[in-house]
Amino acid sequence: MTSEFGSPSESLQAAAEDWMTSAGRLRVYRAGQGPALLLLHSINAVASSAEVRPLFEALQRHRTVYAFDLPGFGRSDRSDRPYTVSLMCAAIQDVGERIRAQHDAAALDAMALSLTCEFLARAVTQQPSAWGHLTLVSPTGFQGAHPRTGSPGSTAEVPGMLKLLHWGGLGRRAFSALTRPSVIRYFLRRTFGREQIDEQLWRDGVQAAQAPGAHWAPLYFLSGALFSKDSLDVYRQLQHPVWMSHGVRGDFTDYRQAQAVLQLPQWSLSVYDTGAIPYFEDGARFIQDMCEFLATPGSVGHQR
């Protein structure tokens, strides 16, 4: 399918492969040499690995950098199936296992953006010895006046919402409305907290919305099914070095519950005078800070 923006393209300009996993076919990107580093994009209507482009391009000078389009996004499998927290975690686990097999089974450092921080944290708690330093950028789960609580594995899915979105093509129409070029620009301005946005990221989003089956996974995002009620408990379980960062502009600035983890010795925090994706605006500083964090000694049980 084509438009004035061209046909859907690769999320990143790098060597790309399709890996078959328990979560389906995943498009995986790789570049550079050195210790492995996995970069994970966020979840939204037009998400893809394009969201980690500045880090992927800069860090490949020092690391073997991997990124992949999560199930239902980018160039990965976008079929009509349930998109769940467990599916996202399985994708992270499977890709992580294959990366480690190519790097002498070394613990894998990883970075995640926004909601995907919850998936990464859960995957790490399921197999702690497989993971190393964790970089969480604008993580969800810390907002609100009261801690988000729930039984293990519970989600914030709105009862009946998925059924409604799958009824009579309603979800497809909602997706089409939310992914018009002008609407994508509107949401990016809210993410950046200003009029100026990254124009390439906008173009990538417009293209991502055109892929066949692009609406299926976002329906589960809209229903709340991908948000975990027990995310704060999952974050608390992490024994790895964790560097959390966020900005001060836009819609993603509420971290009132973060003290629950920031009081733990293995957690650290950086706040940038940016929107929700600091490395798109203050890339040099962010990358320097991230490299310094990744260079610190650490393993399971490490305390900074």
Language model region names:
Residues 119-123:
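Hydrolases whose catalytic domains are alpha/beta-hydrolase-1, hotdog thioesterase
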Residues 27-75:
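Conserved HGGG/HGGXW glycine-rich cap/lid loop of the alpha/beta-hydrolase fold
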Residues 125, 131-170:
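Flexible "cap/lid" loop of the alpha/beta hydrolase fold
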Residues 237-274:
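Conserved loop-alpha-helix segment in the C-terminal half of the alpha/beta-hydrolase fold
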Residues 5-25:
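N-terminal cap/lid segment of alpha/beta-hydrolase-fold proteins
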Residues 274-287:
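Catalytic histidine-centered segment of alpha/beta-hydrolase-like enzymes
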Residues 53, 67-115, 288:
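Active-site loop/oxyanion-hole signature of alpha/beta-hydrolase fold enzymes
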Residues 173-236:
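Conserved alpha/beta-hydrolase catalytic His-Asp/Glu region
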